[in-house]
Amino acid sequence: MTNTRKSHPLIKIVNHSFIDLPAPSNISAWWNFGSLLGVCLGLQILTGLFLAMHYTADTTTAFSSVTHICRDVNYGWLIRYMHANGASMFFIFLYFHIGRGIYYGSYTFMDTWNIGVLLLFAVMATAFMGYVLPWGQMSFWGATVITNLLSAIPYIGPTLVEWIWGGFSVDKATLTRFFAFHFILPFIITAMVMIHLLFLHETGSNNPSGMNSDSDKIPFHPYYTIKDILGILFMMITLMSLVMFTPDLLGDPDNYTPANPLNTPPHIKPEWYFLFAYAILRSIPNKLGGVLALVFSILILMLFPILHSSKQRSMSFRPLSQCLMWMLVANLLILTWIGGQPVEHPFITIGQLASVTYFFTILILMPSTALMENKLLKW
């Protein structure tokens, strides 16, 4: 008789995805982030569900309902800070996951890569709307500034902004709809993750060498299940250390002041994981230009498969491309730092230089260096 694991219509899907899945024998810890992102998503949905049980999406009570969660609900503080810091962990892993994809040339799986970029957009939208919900100063002004950017769209812009707001300013209608979208999007993200995995399992995983690994596969379970569990353990240690010792380390103190439309905070800035994009947005003096640069700074990821000009897939054996890759990482860290600084000299100039370097590295330097490496290897 056939094993239930292999014959049951539902269980066999799980079996082919997580148990009997043939995986390359040499994938490193950089391949752990996919499963960590899955755990993060589950954790966010779970903690978010419990928060939604006590939260009220109304401008008069939203702030005090969050206070009530932290003070009066059993372990409410724990759930709230796990959700807030869980989002930070989510983005750390997302950026590592994308960085791994760029370094090892995983973007050549175009279907998987493109759905991944769409996933990034969906997660960013979810995080942005979630940040608005506590209705603190930074929530309100962040929502006002970012939604206002859409007014830069020619002809339909101003109407579109008022349509999103549900009025003539960020108010009760905006908060209610943001809560609704923030609740539904993670489930849409979960569906997209399944499509992401479906496309990945059509081709199988990439590996550090970038070569075909069909001749050397091992079963996912127990080898990579145990490896993933170790990764999850490290993640939980980091997350719980953050939550227990410095829960507000990554947050903004301004968000502990209830939203006040009559008083603007001294420095309006998003959460740390959006600062690099915010810096690119601010580095262009024109509103529409800034918005286009902001969108393109993420959308540029979709160009990686087209711009790939090397005869090798991975950067493992390409020292010059490796240098550029780490230059890009350093560049993004500089942009993140600039995004959190006030708009004054010398930060404006540094931000503009870093923004230009970001696009120049991806669009010009990386493809031309890859071509040069081909020449050096007489290909």
From Swiss-Prot:
Function: Component of the ubiquinol-cytochrome c reductase complex (complex III or cytochrome b-c1 complex) that is part of the mitochondrial respiratory chain. The b-c1 complex mediates electron transfer from ubiquinol to cytochrome c. Contributes to the generation of a proton gradient across the mitochondrial membrane that is then used for ATP synthesis.
Protein name: Cytochrome b
Residues reported in the UniProt entry to bind a ubiquinone: 201
Note on cofactor: Binds 2 heme b groups non-covalently.
Binding site for heme b b562: 83, 182
UniProt keyword Transmembrane helix present: yes
Organism: Ctenomys mendocinus
Cellular component per GO, a single term: mitochondrial inner membrane
GO molecular function, one term: metal ion binding
Location of the protein in the cell: Mitochondrion inner membrane
Entry membrane topology: Multi-pass membrane protein
Entry-linked InterPro entries: Cyt_b/b6_C, Cyt_b/b6_C_sf, Cyt_b/b6_N, Cytb/b6-like_sf, Cytochrome_b, Cytochrome_b_C_euk/bac, Cytochrome_b_N_euk/bac, Di-haem_cyt_TM
Membrane spanning stretches: 33-53, 77-98, 113-133, 178-198, 226-246, 288-308, 320-340, 347-367
